[in-house]
Curated annotation (Swiss-Prot):
It holds the Pfam family DUF134. It comes from the Bacteria. This is UPF0251 protein VVA1436. It comes from Vibrio vulnificus (strain YJ016). Belongs to the UPF0251 family. InterPro entries: UPF0251 (IPR002852), WH-like_DNA-bd_sf (IPR036388).
């Protein structure tokens, strides 16, 4: 039985709901969902340029967990860019505290 997941502190939610290749209807493309904690990890590491330890403390998780989250997030974004998939983002109605 896996350990219960810790709640992750999410500092902001996106203004858009998805990103997709230009000129192709979204219903014709495969989708990859980016979770709220993955988006927050990208924001902390790549936008605010925090070190992993600082970002992990901000989210309320261990440095190793943060590393796993950011790795998953970057992989999803790269797949969407390289393979032309739709990247769906968490919507505004989701809780700021996310159980992942």
């Amino acid at each position: 039985m896996p350990r219960p997941k810790k709640p992750r502190t999410i500092g902001c939610m996106p203004k858009a709901s998805c990103f997709k290749p230009n000129g192709i209807p979204a219903h014709n493309l495969p989708c990859i969902a980016l979770e709220a904690d993955e988006l927050e990890a990208l924001r902390l590491a790549d936008v605010l340029q925090l070190h992993q330890l600082e970002a992990a403390q901000s989210m309320g998780v261990s440095r190793q967990t943060f590393g796993n989250i950011i790795k998953r997030a970057r992989n999803k974004v790269a797949l969407c860019l390289v393979e032309g998939k739709v990247l769906t983002l968490p919507n505004q109605s989701q809780d700021k505290e996310k159980e992942a």
